Amino acid sequence: MPLKPKLLVFSHICSPQYVTGAEKVLMFMLRELQPYFTCTLVVPTEGVIAQQARAYNIPVICHDVPLVVPLYLALPHLMGEIESLQRTEAWPALIELIRREQPDVALVNTTVHPLPAIAAKMLGVPVIWSVMEAIRFTPHTANSAALIEHCADLVVGISEATLAPLRTPGLLPKSIIIPPSWNPDALHPESWPELRAIRRADLGVADHQKLVGYISASIFDAKGLDHFMQMAVEVSERFPDALFLIVGNPTDPAYFEQCLERARSRDLMGKFRWIRFEENVETIYPAMDITVIPSIEAEGFGMTALEAMVFGRPVVLYGAGGLAEIAGATGNSAYMARPGDTGGLFARVWSLLGDPARMAAAGAHNASAVQAAFGIDVYRRRIVHLVGLLAGRGVLPPSPVKGTGDTVYRFENGLLRPYRTGEALQADGFSYEQVREVSDLLIAMLPKGEPIGSLPPPKRGRRSRTAGRRRVLARARRKRGRRRPIRGIAAGRRRARRIGARHRRPRHPRRGRKTKR
């Protein structure tokens, strides 16, 4: 079988201690693309996702590529900064990397990482641009969109919010949405009750107490920790059994201390717990009773909201960007407050804490609704659609595919069209050596189109052989004077008796001869 197309994936960061939402989404997509591509990950330095990639048998290249933040911020000096970086040693080194690796496709992650896309475009390599955050709306947003339009053969957004600044006539036809998902096999739900008990014991949370959680890989002002603290202080003064958990790494220590001061000034620090980073989220979410996501700026998606719902937690959030889309898709609009409305956060959290039955029902609803909206089966159908688009646009070579069975198919407009015969495959310009083997899951999930080629001539089956045998016997009978063959011993005896009955005459005793007595 020929090799799968090579996909060179550029990650803008590789955090040494914790995984950001963008890194998590990228790694999940990379694993789901492995059935269709030979993937190689390019990271700026060693870190967590580099280790994860190697564990999944994905080669890793450490190669630092400068970021271009003005693309995301839509600043006027965007092109000037790119031209300045192209005059540094980093630019020819990037060109040489892509030339050496010779990928069939390049995937660029986030809107602060344009240099790999520009370099790949120059070398004639098709580009998939994964957009995980919403570009800022400024007078120069059109310049950012124009750069992406020029470089990208396909733009993959994780939400409507991420694609909103890119809804131009040139980008609309080549933009799709693939929201994040999760691998249910990696979460081990049977262990959640035990993990809940262990983690709550470690945090000093009793069974009768309610733990309200805030989680963000990086804590800075846009993530709204100060709004969470204001809500938490008000809740704790009215609900003595409420405790609060903060999970995340402060990237702005001054801001973090300012947030904690809200509780410290009221002598409420004993009600708060803090975990800087936890890679195994399955040990965190089960311990929470409610999860709050108070992002004050538009989120590209909102992985914490998704994860909390997967674990069956009630979620209270601000309707900022992708968070509003998650709330709408899962029927959680009642628990969505207007961004900046801390009173709205308080009212929703308070209503859940005061009604245990309602809190349990909200969690159960989330576990079911998030599966229907963002589950792994939905995600894989979208990946199949992505692969079909790439093949249809000529980004991928349209080589035929097969599963473990014998049927060979051709990708065409998101459909699998089976070849009726090997001659049909050859007439389409392919040999059997060009057929790629893919997972049976892909074959089962893709809708099937019209077969290719003419129906093969009918085969001579057992019935034809029987008819031939009868013709031979008939000829033999004609040669023997049309005598019918004797079928078996008993049949022969019966037939002999019938023949004898026709030809034998009755025997009479001879005259003059006496019978002895």
Pin down the residues of each PLM region:
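A short helix/loop element that forms part of the nucleotide-sugar donor recognition site in Leloir-type
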Residues: 188-205
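Short, surface-exposed polybasic-aromatic patches that bind anionic ligands, especially phosphate groups
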Residues: 395-468
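Short hydrophobic beta-strand element within catalytic cores of glycosyltransferases
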Residues: 314-317
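A conserved mid-protein helix/loop that constitutes part of the nucleotide-sugar donor-binding site
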Residues: 20-28, 210, 219-234, 257, ...
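Nucleotide-activated donor-binding/catalytic signature segment of Leloir-type glycosyltransferases, i.e.
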Residues: 248, 257-277
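Glycosyltransferase donor-sugar binding loop
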Residues: 42-48, 182, 215-216, 243-258
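Conserved acidic donor-binding segment of nucleotide-sugar-dependent glycosyltransferases
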Residues: 329-330, 334-342, 351-356
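A short, well-ordered alpha-helix in the C-terminal region of glycosyltransferases
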Residues: 201, 358-373, 379
